[in-house]
């Protein structure tokens, strides 16, 4: 059953998922690197203003998870670099109601996702060489130019399978939490890929670069396309985001 867990409830999602409750899952509860909240879904909706996208600078979700643990951090969702019928695997390490330690001053404003790939082609264009792809069991990534924090970078983009899962996740979270599927835009209508003067004032989707001037994630994504696709999915939504079941909060860890 493909689902994510929000306030103890299973919400259906159209991509392969592994939660901390499942065999092979990654359980951030055991490390206590987060703040726990006992919230109902309605209370969580009231307290949520954003959903934040990150890139991991790791080849796989497992490595990303290990790095977060070693650094005393956490992230609610991780997207692996695999392909299962056109979608990358989504890992959930905590209930969405918890405050993961992943985006500083906005940790309590919303959950986030680490898209697991190595973007830094500006440093090394051989990160996804044939040898490295074989070593880490990951697919090929294309190089694109992206302007982040007013600097144009040569970056490895995430795969289409990862993007497909990103869109599914955003759709499900926005539907469940009544969150606008919209990135911040300037007066000309362009998505802002730099720090915002007041990130907490934007209700909707954010990149880590909107929160911290030292961050350039998520780099290499076509955010206009992602936003448009998610809005189309939401307009035609039939099953994704549906509440499947409810658990007592005592089973969240």
Regions found by a protein language model. Give the residues of each.
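Basic/polar, cationic surfaces and motifs that engage anionic cell-wall
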Residues: 1-24, 44, 119-253
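N-terminal catalytic cores of peptidoglycan-degrading enzymes
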Residues: 1-109
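Hydrophobic faces of well-ordered beta-strands that scaffold small-molecule active sites
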Residues: 53, 111-113, 205-207
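Peptidoglycan-targeting cell-wall enzymes and recognition modules
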Residues: 63-162
